[in-house]
């Protein structure tokens, strides 16, 4: 029998953590942060205690209390076993927005994360421009005797363990033990978003991820809808944050309005948008070109573009 357990993402914005169990296969779809829970207990400069983070997150109901799921250095230090084998076969990541990926650093490094090339590079950008640990797990509680004969805490690359990241190919089915997975691109405000169709022993499950119909890749979303209709789904997990919202401006409308505003502005024009929204970056880039201006971006976004350019699969896409 196939079961789905929702450990977040229901009646909430974000926090998606869907556990699919079929036969002996267990797969999480996303492992993200709930904005409402984080806002209730934490703030920008106040988070879970490093020395007791798992227990804090369990006590507050933010993370599911599942043995074998979390990184062993945390689990052992916080008396949550840490020596058992994991029963989780993989995490399927729809995309690299924090409400879908923020808690990946808590997971065991030997649980494979399946994602798109774009999502992997965005996670790499997080790691290399902040203290995040999406692609590596830096062991926190290792003590050693230093040259002076006193005890020191091991830090840096010498305690970094690479996570197992598997890049899937859009539209190409692959298997995680008994579950077949078809990743299909959809349009959203960050590159590399993929919906999933899972084929289990008991039927097919669709997960829309976050999707929209008004961006530069709306055709991808429409093709996914068609694929769902063809797949005879038994269950559809659908993102519904703005399901009843009135139609909004398209990205091309935004581009046109920005051109008009910038052309009617003297002197410096300053804009704000999410660093990883490269479609919005393109809108402002086109507006800058059409108004004979130079577009200046921040270093994190510049580095993300560099990572994309270094990828054979993504070079020239942005």
Model feature map: region roles:
Residues 2-12, 16-90, 105-279, 283:
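His/Asp/Glu-rich metal-coordinating catalytic cores
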Residues 15-17, 294, 312:
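Short, surface-exposed beta-edge/turn micro-motifs
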Residues 88-99:
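Metallo-beta-lactamase
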Residues 97, 119, 301:
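A generic "binding-loop/recognition-motif" signal
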Residues 267, 277-295, 300-303:
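Loop-centered beta-sheet repeat module
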Residues 299-318:
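A contiguous, basic/glycine-rich beta-loop/short-helix subdomain that forms a polymer-engagement track
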């Amino acid at each position: 029998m196939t079961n789905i357990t929702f450990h977040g993402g229901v009646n909430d914005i974000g926090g998606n953590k869907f556990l699919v169990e079929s036969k002996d296969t267990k797969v999480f779809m996303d492992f993200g942060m709930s904005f409402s829970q984080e806002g209730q207990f934490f703030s920008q400069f106040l988070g879970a205690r490093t020395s007791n983070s798992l227990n804090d997150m369990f006590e507050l109901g933010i993370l599911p209390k599942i043995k074998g799921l979390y990184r062993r250095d945390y689990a052992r230090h916080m008396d949550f076993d840490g020596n058992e084998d994991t029963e989780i076969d993989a995490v399927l990541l729809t995309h690299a927005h924090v409400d879908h990926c923020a808690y990946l650093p808590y997971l065991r490094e030997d649980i494979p994360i399946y994602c798109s090339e774009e999502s992997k590079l965005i996670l790499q950008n997080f790691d290399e421009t902040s203290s995040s640990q999406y692609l590596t797990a830096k062991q926190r509680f290792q003590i050693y005797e230093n040259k002076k004969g006193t005890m020191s805490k091991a830090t840096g690359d010498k305690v970094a363990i690479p996570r197992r990241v598997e890049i899937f190919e859009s539209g190409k089915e692959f298997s995680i033990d008994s579950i077949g997975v078809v990743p299909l691109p959809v349009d959203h405000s960050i590159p590399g978003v993929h919906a999933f169709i899972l084929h289990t022993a008991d039927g097919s499950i669709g997960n829309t991820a976050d999707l929209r119909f008004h961006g530069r890749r709306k055709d991808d979303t429409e093709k996914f809808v068609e694929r769902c209709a063809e797949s005879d789904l038994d269950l559809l997990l659908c993102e519904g944050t703005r399901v009843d919202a009135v139609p909004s401006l398209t990205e091309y409308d935004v581009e046109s309005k920005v051109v008009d505003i910038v052309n009617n502005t003297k002197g410096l024009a300053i804009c704000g948008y999410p660093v990883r929204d490269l479609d919005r970056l393109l809108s402002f880039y086109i507006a800058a070109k059409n108004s004979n201006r130079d577009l200046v971006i921040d270093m994190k976004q510049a580095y993300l573009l560099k990572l994309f350019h270094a990828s054979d699969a993504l070079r020239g896409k942005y």
